[in-house]
C-alpha cells in the first residue's frame, strides 16, 4: 500500500513504483510485520488450504465465523476510508483524435510510429515505462544508443511521444483509453483516444521457471535482474544463479558480468544452445533446479540433470529465471482478435489482422523484430517435466497458486480454463496472469491430455494494468458526478427546522421534528394535523415533462396503459407506464393543457427514465409521430396545499375563485396568473385530502411558501415532510412505484388492468400482458393488511408463508407499513398471491424468526368513499 490518509492507494505493484523522496510504502498482507508474518504459518499446513478450500474446509460452525480472518489473510490492501476524508488530488481527462496510435515504445513501436509519420499521418505513441526502448534499452550502451537514435528520428518525423502513459483498453468504435501518471498539480490523467489506426506494440512478458520453492525472495525474472543492473545500476544479488529454457539467459549472464556481478552458473533445460556461454561461467545443460534454499531470502539451489545422475549444490543470493516469452496480446484480444498456438515457439500469437489494428514486434510473436533473441523459444516438454520433488511449485506467484492446485482442479473436473481461473484464483491478482497463464495452460493440458490450444486462454478484458477509480472518475466525484439537488424552497425548509434526507438525488425534508421528537413521531403529528387542518408540502422534485405536437395525444396513448387522447382540455388522468415486458416502471398524472399540449407528471426519481423512454420510442419506433418531449422539472416549482382547510388558505391568499372545490373538480388543471406569476394549478391528491398542486416558476416557489405559511398561522397550518406523506398515502392504499412494486409487477397485480381490453389503441407492453404468466390466477396482487391484534406494526419485507410456515412456499410480502394516526392502528400494503380474492382471510407473515398474525383487507383504509379529496368532508 502506498501513501497515507486520503492519498493511500492499495494493491499497487512494487515493480511499477518509481522510488522518490518521501515515498511511504507498507506491505499489504504481512501481519504483524514482514519480519514476523503469522500468515506464513499457512505454508506449513498446505493440506488445509488447497484450491477452493473455502468451499469445503470450513463447513462448521459456518462460513461467517471464518470469513473475516480469511479475507484479512487474502492479501488485499486497505483503501482510504471514510475517516480520512476525500482524495485531495486532482485528476484530469483528455479526449483526442489522431490518425495513428502506437501502444508501446520499444524498437518495433518506434519504427512503426516513424513509418506512419513519414507517410504524413498524425501519430501518437504511448509507452507505459518512464523511458523508451523496451527490451533494447537494457542491452548495454549499444542498445541505449540505438533507442536514442530511434527516439530522435521519431521526434524529427513529428511523432508525439508520451512516456509513463499506458494504453489499458481497446473498445468499440476505435476507442482506446490510457492512463498517465502526471505528477505535480494533477496526479493522473485519463486519455480517451479515437484513432483511425492503432498499432499494438506491447512487447512480450518473460515467463518464470517452475521448480519447488520458486517463491523464495530473490527468485526473479532474468529480464528484471538485467533491467535493474543496466537502467538503475542496482545489483539484485552478489552471486546470481541463472536458470533458463532459452538463449536470453546467456545474454543476461554477460550483462551481469559486465556490471561486476558474479554469475554462479547457468542451468539450461535444453541440451544445446545457440548462444555462447560467458567466459568462466559453468553451464549445466539438460538440467533443472529441483529446490531453492533459504527462508527469508534465497541462499542457493539444488540442480539435478534430467538423467538424475548429476547433482550440484550451488550457493547464490539471487536466482534469475528465463522461461521464455509470452506475447502481450491483451489489447489485440480486447479488440476482438483471436489467438493461435505457435507450436514451434510455444506461445499464443495473433491469428489474423483486425480492421484498423496492426500488431508488430514481439507482441506479434516476431521475436527478432522485437529485438528479443531469436532462439528464446522454451520447450513445452521442459515446462512440464518437473518430476515430483519436495516443496511447492508455484505457478501464480502473487496468488500462491501451485501446480498441485492446477492438478486438483483437473481432478475435480474444473477443466475449462475459465473455471480453473476462478476455482484456484490463478491469474486473478493484480498482474492478471501475465506471467503465469501459459505455464498454467501447459500444466492443465498435461493433466487432462490436451494441447494448449485445446485448453485455450481466458478472455482478456480491460484494463491491461490496474487503474485507480479516481483516474476513471476524473473530476466527476462527489456532487460533480451525482449533484445533490436542492429544492427552490430549500431555505424555507431550513427555517422550519426540516430534517433533510436524500430522496432520489434531491435533498428533501423527511419531517420537521419539534424539540424531543423522533422522526416517526414528527411524521405522525404532521399527518394527523394535515387531516385536521391544512399542510404545506413542496413537491418541486415531482417529475414534469411537456409533451406537445400534432400527434402528442396518440403518442401518449402508445406510452400509457390508459387512454389519454380522450382527455378534454383542462382534464387530468392518472396513468401507469410499463416496459416491453409489461412491468410497471413509473406512474403519474397526465393533464391536457391544449389539444396538442400535455403536462406529464412522473415520480421524482423516475423523470429521467421516463423522458429517455419517450425519446427512445420516438426516435426508434414511432419516428413518424410529430411530437416534442421537453423535461421541465427544474424550471417549475411545486407547492402542494392539502387538507380540509386547503381552499380556505388559498382563498386568503387571493387566488382565483375558479379554484374553489365547488367550481374546480378533482383531477382538473387550471392555468391562472396571480400577483404577476403564471401558475398551473392541478386538483389532485396523493394523501386523500382536498389538494391543490400549484406549479409556478421555480424562482417564485419560496415567495409563495412564505406567503402561504404566514397566512396559514390562523388556520393551524403545518409543514409536511416526505414521511408524513408516506403515512397518509398508505392510509389511502395509494401505490408507491418502487416501494410497492418490483421488477415483476404487472398492471393487473396492482388493479390497473381495468379497461385494457376495451382500449382500441395499442400501447407499449400490451402483448406481454397476454402471456400465460401474466394471466396466471396465482399472481401476487396488492392488498391491505392489518395486524390481528390491531397493535403490532407489520415489518416491511416480512413474508407470507403458506401453512404450516417456513420453509414453506412464499405467498407474498409486506411492501409498506405505518401506524395510522387517523385510525389509531397499524396498516400495511402487501403483494399477496390471489390477494383480492382473500379479503377477510387471516394469514401469518414471518420476519427474522418472528411470526405476525394479519388480516387481509380491502383498501383504502381511510375515507374509503373519497369524500375528503372531493372537499365534501
Where are these regions (language model features)?
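Acidic, proline/glycine-enriched N-terminal capping motif
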Residues: 439, 446-578, 583
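Well-ordered mid-protein domain cores that form the structural environment of catalytic cofactors
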Residues: 565-596, 601-617
Amino acid at each position: 500500500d502506498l501513501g497515507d490518509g486520503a492519498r493511500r492507494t492499495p494493491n499497487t505493484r512494487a515493480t511499477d513504483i518509481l522510488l522518490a523522496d518521501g515515498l511511504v510504502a507498507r506491505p499489504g498482507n504481512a501481519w504483524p510485520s514482514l519480519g514476523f508474518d503469522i500468515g506464513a504459518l499457512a505454508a506449513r499446513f498446505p493440506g488445509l488450504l488447497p484450491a477452493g478450500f473455502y468451499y469445503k474446509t470450513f463447513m462448521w460452525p459456518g462460513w461467517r465465523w471464518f470469513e473475516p480472518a480469511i479475507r484479512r489473510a487474502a492479501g488485499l490492501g486497505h483503501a482510504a476510508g471514510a475517516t480520512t476524508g476525500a482524495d485531495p488530488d486532482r485528476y484530469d481527462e483528455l479526449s483526442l483524435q489522431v490518425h495513428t496510435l502506437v501502444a508501446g515504445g520499444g524498437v518495433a513501436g518506434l519504427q512503426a510510429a516513424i513509418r506512419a509519420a513519414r507517410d504524413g499521418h498524425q501519430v501518437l505513441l504511448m509507452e507505459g515505462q518512464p523511458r523508451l526502448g523496451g527490451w533494447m534499452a537494457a542491452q548495454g550502451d549499444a542498445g541505449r544508443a540505438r533507442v536514442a537514435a530511434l527516439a530522435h528520428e521519431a521526434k524529427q518525423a513529428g511523432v508525439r511521444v508520451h512516456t509513463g502513459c499506458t494504453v489499458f483498453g481497446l473498445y468499440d468504435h476505435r476507442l482506446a483509453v490510457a492512463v498517465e501518471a502526471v505528477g505535480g498539480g494533477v496526479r493522473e490523467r485519463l486519455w480517451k483516444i479515437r484513432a483511425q489506426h492503432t498499432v499494438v506494440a506491447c512487447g512480450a512478458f518473460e515467463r518464470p521457471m517452475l521448480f519447488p520453492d520458486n517463491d523464495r525472495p530473490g527468485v526473479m525474472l532474468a529480464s528484471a535482474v538485467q533491467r535493474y543492473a543496466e537502467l538503475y545500476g542496482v545489483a539484485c544479488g552478489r552471486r546470481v544463479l541463472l536458470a533458463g529454457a532459452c538463449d536470453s539467459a546467456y545474454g543476461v549472464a554477460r550483462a551481469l558480468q559486465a556490471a561486476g556481478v558474479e554469475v554462479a552458473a547457468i542451468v539450461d533445460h535444453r541440451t544445446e544452445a545457440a548462444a555462447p556461454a560467458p567466459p568462466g561461467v559453468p553451464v549445466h545443460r539438460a538440467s533443472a533446479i529441483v529446490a531453492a534454499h533459504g527462508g527469508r531470502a534465497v541462499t542457493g539451489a539444488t540442480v539435478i540433470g534430467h538423467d538424475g545422475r548429476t547433482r550440484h549444490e550451488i550457493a547464490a543470493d539471487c536466482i534469475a529465471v528465463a522461461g521464455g516469452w509470452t506475447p502481450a496480446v491483451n489489447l489485440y484480444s480486447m479488440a476482438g482478435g483471436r489467438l493461435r498456438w505457435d507450436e514451434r515457439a510455444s506461445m499464443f500469437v495473433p491469428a489474423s489482422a483486425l480492421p484498423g489494428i496492426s500488431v508488430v514486434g514481439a507482441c506479434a510473436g516476431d521475436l527478432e523484430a522485437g529485438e528479443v533473441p531469436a532462439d528464446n523459444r522454451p520447450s513445452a516438454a521442459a515446462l512440464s517435466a518437473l518430476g515430483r520433488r519436495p516443496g511447492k511449485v508455484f505457478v501464480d506467484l502473487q496468488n500462491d497458486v501451485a501446480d498441485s492446485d492446477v492438478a486438483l482442479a483437473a481432478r475435480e473436473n474444473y477443466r475449462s480454463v475459465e473455471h480453473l481461473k476462478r476455482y484456484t484464483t490463478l491469474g486473478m491478482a493484480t498482474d492478471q496472469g501475465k506471467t503465469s497463464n501459459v505455464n498454467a495452460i501447459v500444466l492443465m493440458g498435461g493433466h487432462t491430455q490436451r494441447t494448449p490450444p485445446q485448453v485455450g486462454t481466458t478472455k482478456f478484458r480491460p484494463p491491461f494494468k490496474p487503474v485507480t477509480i479516481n483516474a476513471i472518475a476524473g473530476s466527476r466525484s462527489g456532487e460533480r458526478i451525482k449533484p445533490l439537488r436542492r429544492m427552490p424552497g430549500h431555505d424555507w425548509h431550513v427555517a422550519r427546522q426540516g430534517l433533510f434526507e436524500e430522496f432520489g438525488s434531491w435533498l428533501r425534508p423527511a419531517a420537521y421534528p419539534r424539540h424531543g421528537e423522533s422522526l416517526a413521531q414528527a411524521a405522525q403529528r404532521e399527518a394527523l394535523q394535515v387531516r385536521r387542518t391544512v399542510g404545506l408540502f413542496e413537491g418541486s422534485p415531482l417529475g414534469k415533462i411537456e409533451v406537445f405536437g400534432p400527434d402528442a395525444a396518440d403518442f401518449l396513448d402508445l406510452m400509457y396503459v390508459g387512454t389519454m387522447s380522450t382527455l378534454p382540455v383542462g382534464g387530468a388522468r392518472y396513468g401507469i407506464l410499463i416496459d416491453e415486458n409489461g412491468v410497471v416502471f413509473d406512474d403519474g398524472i397526465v393533464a391536457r393543457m391544449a389539444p396538442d399540449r400535455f403536462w406529464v407528471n412522473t415520480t421524482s426519481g423516475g423523470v429521467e427514465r421516463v423522458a429517455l423512454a419517450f425519446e427512445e420510442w420516438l426516435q426508434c419506433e414511432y419516428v413518424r409521430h410529430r411530437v416534442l418531449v421537453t423535461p421541465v422539472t427544474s424550471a417549475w416549482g411545486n407547492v402542494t396545499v392539502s387538507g380540509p382547510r386547503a381552499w380556505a388558505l388559498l382563498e386568503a391568499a387571493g387566488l382565483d375563485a375558479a379554484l374553489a372545490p365547488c367550481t374546480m373538480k378533482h383531477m382538473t388543471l387550471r392555468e391562472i396568473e396571480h400577483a404577476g406569476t403564471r401558475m398551473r394549478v392541478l386538483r389532485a391528491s396523493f394523501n386523500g385530502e382536498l389538494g391543490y398542486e400549484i406549479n409556478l416558476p421555480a424562482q417564485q416557489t419560496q415567495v409563495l411558501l412564505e406567503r402561504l405559511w404566514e397566512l396559514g398561522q390562523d388556520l393551524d397550518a403545518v409543514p409536511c415532510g416526505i414521511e408524513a406523506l408516506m403515512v397518509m398515502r398508505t392510509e389511502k392504499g395509494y401505490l408507491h412505484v418502487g416501494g410497492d412494486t418490483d421488477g415483476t409487477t404487472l398492471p393487473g397485480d396492482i388493479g390497473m388492468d381495468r379497461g385494457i381490453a376495451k382500449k382500441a389503441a395499442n400501447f407499449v407492453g400490451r402483448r406481454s400482458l397476454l402471456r400465460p404468466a401474466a394471466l396466471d390466477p396465482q399472481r401476487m396482487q396488492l392488498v391491505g393488511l392489518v395486524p390481528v391484534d390491531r397493535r403490532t406494526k407489520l415489518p416491511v419485507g416480512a413474508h407470507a408463508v403458506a401453512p404450516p410456515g417456513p420453509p414453506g412456499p412464499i405467498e407474498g410480502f409486506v411492501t409498506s407499513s405505518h401506524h395510522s394516526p387517523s385510525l389509531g392502528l397499524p396498516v400495511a400494503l402487501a403483494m399477496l398471491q390471489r390477494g383480492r380474492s382473500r379479503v377477510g382471510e387471516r394469514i401469518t407473515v414471518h420476519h427474522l424468526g418472528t411470526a405476525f398474525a394479519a388480516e387481509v383487507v380491502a383498501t383504502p383504509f381511510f375515507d374509503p368513499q373519497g369524500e375528503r379529496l372531493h372537499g365534501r368532508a
